[in-house]
Curated annotation (Swiss-Prot):
Protein name (database record): Small ribosomal subunit protein bS6
Residue span of region Disordered: 96-124
Any one Gene Ontology BP term: translation
SUPFAM superfamilies on file: Ribosomal protein S6
Organism annotation: Cupriavidus pinatubonensis (strain JMP 134 / LMG 1197) (Cupriavidus necator (strain JMP 134))
InterPro entries linked to this entry: Ribosomal_bS6 (IPR000529), Ribosomal_bS6_sf (IPR035980), Ribosomal_S6_plastid/chlpt (IPR020814), Transl_elong_EF1B/ribsomal_bS6 (IPR014717)
Keywords associated with the record: Ribonucleoprotein, Ribosomal protein, RNA-binding, rRNA-binding
A Pfam family per the record: Ribosomal_S6
Family, per entry: Belongs to the bacterial ribosomal protein bS6 family.
Length: 124
């Protein structure tokens, strides 16, 4: 089995459906003997360019280990899900379990926002 990193972009109106989508894709991989090593929900982010007249979308990154048949089925599921605007599948040499640089940035932003709200609350 090979290791893959998958990033998919979900329509912003479907953001509340993302946890269910992640579970569906995880169960698809595990039911066929694969493994899910890392799941990162990067949240709503500004896109580099507009897709379908949208400037923001919900980003998700998943690292998996699976066979070619499972990967083909997963790609088929992405193509026929209208909520998925784009997807990218990259083969990796080994399983990635540490937080990605993007996830570290998301965590920094959340920590900064939390610190900002506490300082505003103390000032009031």
């Amino acid at each position: 089995m090979r290791h893959y990193e998958i990033v998919f972009i979900v329509h912003p109106d479907q953001s509340e459906q993302v946890p269910a989508m992640i579970e569906r894709y995880k169960s698809l991989v595990t039911s066929q003997g694969g493994q899910v090593h890392r799941v990162e929900d990067w949240g709503r982010r500004q896109m580099a360019y507009m897709i379908q007249k949208l400037a923001k979308a919900h980003y998700v990154c998943v690292n998996i280990e699976c066979g070619k048949e499972t990967l083909a089925e997963l790609e088929h599921a992405f193509k026929f899900n209208d909520a998925v605007l784009r997807h990218l599948i990259v083969q990796t040499k080994k399983a990635e379990t540490a937080p990605s640089p993007m996830m570290k940035e998301v965590q920094r932003e959340e920590a900064r926002k939390a610190a900002q709200t506490t300082t505003e609350g103390q000032a009031a």
